[in-house]
Amino acid sequence: MWTPELAILRGFPTEAERQQWKQEGVVGSESGSFLQLLLEGNYEAIFLNSMTQNIFNSTTTAEEKIDSYLEKQVVTFLDYSTDLDTTERQQLIFLLGVSSLQLFVQSNWTGPPVDLHPQDFLSSVLFQQFSEVKGLDAFVLSLLTLDGESIYSLTSKPILLLLARIILVNVRHKLTAIQSLPWWTLRCVNIHQHLLEERSPLLFTLAENCIDQVMKLQNLFVDDSGRYLAIQFHLECAYVFLYYYEYRKAKDQLDIAKDISQLQIDLTGALGKRTRFQENYVAQLILDVRREGDVLSNCEFTPAPTPQEHLTKNLELNDDTILNDIKLADCEQFQMPDLCAEEIAIILGICTNFQKNNPVHTLTEVELLAFTSCLLSQPKFWAIQTSALILRTKLEKGSTRRVERAMRQTQALADQFEDKTTSVLERLKIFYCCQVPPHWAIQRQLASLLFELGCTSSALQIFEKLEMWEDVVICYERAGQHGKAEEILRQELEKKETPSLYCLLGDVLGDHSCYDKAWELSRYRSARAQRSKALLHLRNKEFQECVECFERSVKINPMQLGVWFSLGCAYLALEDYQGSAKAFQRCVTLEPDNAEAWNNLSTSYIRLKQKVKAFRTLQEALKCNYEHWQIWENYILTSTDVGEFSEAIKAYHRLLDLRDKYKDVQVLKILVRAVIDGMTDRSGDVATGLKGKLQELFGRVTSRVTNDGEIWRLYAHVYGNGQSEKPDENEKAFQCLSKAYKCDTQSNCWEKDITSFKEVVQRALGLAHVAIKCSKNKSSSQEAVQMLSSVRLNLRGLLSKAKQLFTDVATGEMSRELADDITAMDTLVTELQDLSNQFRNQY
């Protein structure tokens, strides 16, 4: 490995490394001068260096494409230059590639603005085909388009990213002397991805390859220096995986970084005060950070903290009630250790992962604010401070007492880009271990906040300056100025026709011809054009055309999560369940935590009669969203279908948690039959063993739903319907049947219909027989008499109603249909009376 590679990755050399370079003669070489400028953060000087000028000032034709020219010049220098040896040529080109990337990041992410122009280091012949620099930028942006996804139109100095990509990606196979190159390729890929509208499968594949290559570098992560770099690498990998929906892999990478650092990070409760006038300390949620070891004690390998005056100021809340920070009752108990850059970055990474894996909810916001409070309590690094403040402003904008600070803080974050007091070297410390958004994204956040607060004109001013026409259109549309939105887009199209502008015009007008024009302009490569056209078909319920457009879009870029989901829905509408299953399968592959996609996938499997697959997919859906009652309802039905009776009981309990009066009599019938008949479940176990759990479930159900006779009868059935050998079970069955009878007789019109009347009579007779059996096991004769008397009264009431309602007025005779029932009731009333008398004689 070339000696300075670790320092370049780290962003600074140690004193020992400086001495080693002097001894090895690194400093005096051509690459040594580049190295010194790079480590000083003087990236522009590298491009103004005579060596760089010589590489790129070769003869060319005006017709030659700029990317071809740049790559040709780099390859020519690497292969044919005789002034330097092969290794040093590779080192120079590598340093040029890293400088290009760093300068591009400075120009678009960190600031301050870059003064370098392409004309400063490239041949003037290259610019003859462009009337102005904007024309060159637009052409370069088109070269950086991938998988049909365009790049933000006002990206600054895109030529720098193009050059970085040529060196770190296209010709990386020629830089064999640089072992750490795959890591820089990964960084270049990550920066490129964040400029695209959607995730690029090409970039993700390249990122995965880079990660694998870095993992194989044995000597990169050894000794104390390697430990710090290992943490940085695993954090960078975690952010890559998070962005591409690989949440499990991201968590694994974060866990590795945390294990290396030996940090213990926990959300916990502590007594404290939040308001100025609070008298008592109450439990507050805080982040407790502790070191379990001292593995990161060698501070020469970690970046030195930036002076606070050079960091974005953490603005005060200035509220007359709420304190700026929680005032803890015992500050020393939760005293946080003095953390290094990598340790703070781990906390930020865990916070970001937590945010991605939890629903938007008040509790989640409170937990995230505990993370931001912790991060901001040790202001040391520009990238971490900026990331934490951006997250806090997003969390605070919904609070009436905090929105004013959120507004001021976002403005301060937007303004810091132009501020030249903080050097780029300070801003780039630990930069790649954080997800700092580009500076225009912060300005967009400011404009969005202004719009939400009702400052529409100020928001529009920022959006128009940023040329974020989609946001401009949304502003006008929400303000009801539909004509103005169309006017703005047509004005921009007169200046230059682009696929994205035609797509936006199509969104405003709902006109397919606009999307067709965008598709044509993109040379049939715009995933956005087909995506937008499909969505219009979807709104118009033209599902067949919708499916065709979505399929074209995902063929260009298969990483469009939202498109796969909408495609699945369109296939469901067409009743093409094979198609919907395929689409939702791709959805959950991209985002394994998408509960709705899992649920819809199970629906597709159910329609395809693949019930076991449906059951498994619903299990995955519930892992993602435990609160979604519709998923639980699908789960309970599928569980009973496939014979997972234990899971069905568990699901019924959960539905009772989520919906207080939930009932599904059909499911309860299946469960009762399974338990009583001793059916085998999917695993081959006999369901009789679930009797206790089913009784417990019925106890909960009947405590919530008290007026359903069918449920009470099923409950009695679980206890043997009064025919059990256990007296206590017969007693319980009698109680359930009594309540069922009460529900039956309280319902409307049962006595006016002879069929319904006969059903009630049969239930009353059955209840009477159970009462007779139970009475014989009563220890108290008085209780036995009460039981028999209640059922005898039921029968007498029915006899009375029968005579009243079903006697022929002309003949005075009872309906023949009830003759047997009347006889049975009369006989049973007599038997009950005799048995009651026997018990009375025992008093």
Curated annotation (Swiss-Prot):
List the keywords (alphabetical): Repeat, TPR repeat
The ranges of the TPR repeats are: 453-486, 492-525, 527-560, 561-594, 596-628, 629-662
Q: Gene3D superfamilies this protein is in?
A: Tetratricopeptide repeat domain
Pfam assignment, any one: TPR_16
Q: Which family does it belong to?
A: Belongs to the TTC27 family.
Identification of the protein by name:
Tetratricopeptide repeat protein 27
